[in-house]
Amino acid sequence: MRIKKGDLVEVISGKDKGKRGKVLRVIPKENKVIVENVNMVKRHQRPVPQLREGGIIEREAPIYASKVMVVCPACDKRTRVGYRFTEDGKKVRYCKKCGEIIDKD
C-alpha cells in the first residue's frame, strides 16, 4: 500500500468525491484507510459512567484505498506514487507528475 498515515489524499469516487483530508489510520489487511472528515457516519454510543456520555456521535468510517489518491505537497495535484532510492540508499516515495520526493523524513 503506497498510502501512509499523515498523507494528504483526495477522494476520486463516491459520495465524497473531491474532498481532501489527512489519513488518520491505514488498515492494510482490509486495504482501507480512514481519512479526516470523509465518509462520516453516525453511531449510537451508550453512556459509560465516569468515562463518557451517551448519544449520537459522528465519526469517520474506513474507505477503500483505491478510492483515494495522494496529493503531492509540491505541485498540489493528485498523483500516482513511485519509489526510488536516494544516494544514501534510502527508499523514498516520489510524485510521478513533478518528480519531487513526498516523504518528509
UniProtKB/Swiss-Prot annotation:
Name of this protein: Large ribosomal subunit protein uL24
Q: How does it assemble?
A: Part of the 50S ribosomal subunit.
What role does this protein play? One of two assembly initiator proteins, it binds directly to the 5'-end of the 23S rRNA, where it nucleates assembly of the 50S subunit.
Do you know which PANTHER family this protein is assigned to? MITOCHONDRIAL RIBOSOMAL PROTEIN L24
HAMAP family, alphabetically? Ribosomal_uL24_B
GO cellular component terms, alphabetically, are: cytosolic large ribosomal subunit
Where do transmembrane segments lie in this chain?
none
Q: Which NCBIfam families match?
A: rplX_bact
User: Which InterPro entries does this entry report, sorted A to Z?
Assistant: KOW (IPR005824), Rib_uL2_dom2 (IPR014722), Ribosomal_uL24 (IPR003256), Ribosomal_uL24_CS (IPR005825), Ribosomal_uL24_KOW (IPR041988), Translation_prot_SH3-like_sf (IPR008991)
A single GO molecular function, which one?
rRNA binding
Write the record's keywords in alphabetical order, separated by commas. Ribonucleoprotein, Ribosomal protein, RNA-binding, rRNA-binding
**Which Pfam families does the annotation name?**
KOW, ribosomal_L24
Concerning its family, UniProt says: Belongs to the universal ribosomal protein uL24 family.
Q: Tell me which Gene Ontology terms the entry assigns under biological process.
A: translation
Query: Which SUPFAM superfamilies does this one have?
Result: Translation proteins SH3-like domain
The organism's superkingdom is given as Bacteria
